[in-house]
């Protein structure tokens, strides 16, 4: 017998404000959220989750069969969402993933419900290569929901540049800043590193990059953005792949030999630096395509 799919709406002090469950799916419609409110999802290791009507549904992997989602409410956390996403009554859904969906070839990096944990906040102005390139939250078993993105730098620690923005399924060309132009960015540092953790072994064979492309000119005739023309991808088996992105906001596909891995890391990212640009390189979205190795 399988567990029921359950969604709970909890207050800051743990009081249950609302709850819904079902054998295969659950739908809850919380009223206005209060500070500190959170949603708790449980019932399966693979769930299709939608945390708000304005957020894409995605399949997530839950090692312990559940996860808690604090409602984004502070000034930084909401910058990667459309205004009003978590205001007023919202329909929240969860459904059990079917075997065929779990085993399907798909984008394994998609998770609009991803979030930055407190243990992952780093100094945006630290000396080069001094910030950790691995997530201490993942290492400490604190991440409940995968895929999960982590970066060793976030520009000014602003929410519109969080690593989670690169796996939320949204990509808009020609701008930068808050939604809908949110991205992952680490300013103009040369030691930037981004990792997508899958939480279990998967087999991957290509990535699709959506580079940020704010190429509008300022009053000095300079473009805001540049791009990485060399990047080294590292996998948990120790293998590496070198790719060469181009200057475009269109999706760029990079296939490689299939490999089993628990993460994909941008180990090195070399930006093109020219006088006609402010030389900010950033990522709107990364897709990592492959299959799940679990037989569930």
Label each region the model flagged:
Residues 204-206:
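Contiguous beta-strand segments within globular domains
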Residues 198-201, 257-259:
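Hydrophobic loop/turn residues within beta-sheet-rich immunoglobulin-like superfamily modules
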Residues 33-34, 44, 202, 226-228, ...:
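Short proline/glycine-enriched turn/loop motifs at strand-loop junctions of beta-rich domains
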């Amino acid at each position: 017998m399988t567990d029921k799919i359950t969604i709970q709406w909890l207050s800051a002090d743990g009081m249950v404000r609302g709850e819904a469950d079902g054998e295969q799916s659950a739908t809850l419609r919380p009223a206005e959220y209060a500070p500190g409110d959170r949603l708790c999802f449980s019932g399966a290791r693979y769930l299709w989750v939608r945390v708000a009507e304005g957020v894409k549904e995605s399949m997530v992997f839950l090692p312990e069969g559940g996860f808690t989602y604090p409602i984004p409410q502070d000034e930084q956390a909401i910058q990667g969402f459309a205004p009003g996403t978590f205001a007023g009554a919202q329909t929240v859904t969860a459904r059990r993933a079917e075997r065929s969906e779990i085993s399907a070839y798909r984008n394994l990096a998609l998770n609009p419900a991803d979030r930055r944990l407190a243990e992952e906040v780093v100094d945006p102005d630290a000396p080069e290569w001094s910030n950790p390139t691995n997530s201490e939250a993942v290492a400490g078993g604190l991440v409940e929901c995968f895929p999960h993105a982590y970066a060793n730098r976030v520009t000014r620690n602003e929410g519109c540049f969080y690593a989670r923005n690169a796996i939320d399924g949204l990509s808009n060309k020609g701008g930068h800043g808050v939604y809908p132009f949110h991205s992952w960015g680490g300013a103009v540092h040369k030691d930037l590193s981004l990792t997508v953790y899958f939480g279990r072994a998967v087999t991957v064979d290509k990535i699709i990059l959506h580079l940020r492309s704010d190429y509008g000119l300022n009053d000095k005739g300079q473009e805001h953005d540049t791009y990485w023309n060399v990047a080294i991808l590292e996998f948990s088996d120790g293998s590496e792949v070198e790719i060469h992105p181009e200057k475009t906001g269109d999706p760029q596909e990079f296939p490689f030999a299939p490999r089993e891995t628990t993460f994909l890391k941008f180990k090195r990212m070399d930006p093109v630096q020219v006088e006609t640009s402010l030389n900010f390189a950033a990522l709107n979205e990364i897709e990592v395509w492959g299959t799940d190795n679990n037989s569930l």
